[in-house]
Amino acid sequence: MSVGLLRILVQNQVVTVEQAEHYYNESQAGKEVLPMLFSDGVISPKSLAALIARVFSYSILDLRHYPRHRVLMGVLTEEQMVEFHCVPVFRRGDKVFFAVSDPTQMPQIQKTVSAAGIAVELVIVEDDQLAGLLDWVGSRSTSLLQELGEGQEEEESHTLYIDNEEAEDGPVPRFIHKTLSDALRSGASDIHFEFYEHNARIRFRVDGQLREVVQPPIAVRGQLASRIKVMSRLDISEKRIPQDGRMQLTFQKGGKPVDFRVSTLPTLFGEKVVMRILNSDAASLNIDQLGFEPFQKKLLLEAIHRPYGMVLVTGPTGSGKTVSLYTCLNILNTESVNIATAEDPAEINLPGINQVNVNDKQGLTFAAALKSFLRQDPDIIMVGEIRDLETADIAIKAAQTGHMVFSTLHTNNAPATLSRMLNMGVAPFNIASSVSLIMAQRLLRRLCSSCKQEVERPSASALKEVGFTDEDLAKDWKLYGAVGCDRCRGQGYKGRAGVYEVMPISEEMQRVIMNNGTEVGILDVAYKEGMVDLRRAGILKIMQGITSLEEVTANTND
């Protein structure tokens, strides 16, 4: 206990000067003073927390309702948490909030984390609750992690990974299996195994956000990476270049197999491994669950049910383009049609569809696959991505000769897709005569329905600056914000919803394209014809109580 805290107790007449001197001497003798204060009946943990919060103007956090899995394990070591008697409990931007019962520890905390660019904020907690949380942190290294680190030297003995029962039942395989199982339960899309000079960490990407879940012993970093490479049939002896692989695992008897795409990357302190969980469940391909507004859904369904043409989906990596395309294919997947796809790689396994993984090294490019498809009597073709003029020309030829073609590009919005194709060298006539509809999309985090709370609306001028109209402001709707609870693991968000910019290619737009119209000109026609852009689609989601204002402004352009 610090002298500063004893001084505060004296100033607030909780203890006398003589008592303070007594407790100070006890602390100098190595004894814990706060438990003595509590056991002597001088003050209770609750009263002490209230006093400290009032004196220092800090907020109080009740740890009885705090979801412990939110503890930020990568900010301080367990030893530092015990030494400073604090726990990092949550993060807001570059600020990390530390739960403390003695705020005079703040300088030591700041000194420790300043090199990482972390701004320190404190919240006051009752000392007995903090002790309980520290005990939980200490026990968090489960018996599996302890076993994982016991007797391990930092070496890469590949004899550990022979294919027999003893190897499969070892601590490293079991730890990996548990990590992957935890990732599935948490709804993660990606798993990051990262290795640094003095520590290692594993992070899950859930609803688009990365968060740390565990720190395995640094001594086994090579064994973790090698084991994953064996499971995904990669070369464990090659550590100098990136490798890509794939694995399929079943986590319970009779359960569905789960596919993982694996990527390794040589770094300064070992190979980083990222695993993408591939959701191959066709049952999830429900158009009503994707977040389309009713009029957008109608436009899309009209376009995909045409006998021929091209539907293009655009957006950044991780924006849900593959799911949107496969949802369309799932709708069209009947006994009477022949569907072929070329992907890099195929992420969703859909029965009844002929799926091809492209392999540039072997000459099986998107363009080569497309040429072969046209000799396979196809009705519907999907190309994972139009990357070059050759692929674009073949796809357009297919759309012009009686086939329905689906593909993706990486652009910021729907009108920019036409500009991208023109820049590739595609003739304006070919674009105008083949493209039926372009759809841009983003994924926004859904507010957790269990804990979202109504918040006060910003001023009308502030909302208008975001994109709200006078008509919007006159309507009766509530603005909600993120809070955090056990169901959403303290994030305030659970799941994601799509926002879409659906732009059908009308006759007027065809004329603009034929006349080498600019992106601005195309956008002007789209707005006149009633297109809703991504920001507007996000505003509709805010008014429906699905997402927050912060989420929309962070992920869409005004």
Swiss-Prot record:
GO cellular component: cytoplasm; plasma membrane
InterPro entries hit by this protein: AAA+_ATPase, ATPase_typ4_pilus-assembl_PilB, P-loop_NTPase, T2SS/T4SS_dom, T2SS_E_N_sf, T2SS_GspE_N
Alphabetized Pfam families for the sequence: MshEN, T2SSE
Keywords, in A-Z order: ATP-binding, Cytoplasm, Fimbrium biogenesis, Nucleotide-binding, Protein transport, Transport
Coiled coil segments of this chain: none
Keyword ATP-binding in annotation: yes
Location of this chain's protein in the cell: Cytoplasm
Origin superkingdom: Bacteria
GO molecular function: ATP binding; ATP hydrolysis activity
Cell inner membrane in keyword set: no
Binding site for ATP: 315-322
SMART domains, alphabetized: AAA
Signal peptide as annotated in the record: none
GO biological process: pilus assembly; protein transport
Job of this protein: Involved in the translocation of the type IV pilin.
Cited PANTHER family: PROTEIN TRANSPORT PROTEIN HOFB HOMOLOG, TYPE II SECRETION SYSTEM PROTEIN GSPE-RELATED
Family classification: Belongs to the GSP E family.
Protein name: Type IV pilus assembly protein PilF
Organism: Neisseria gonorrhoeae
Taxonomic lineage from the root: Bacteria, Pseudomonadati, Pseudomonadota, Betaproteobacteria, Neisseriales
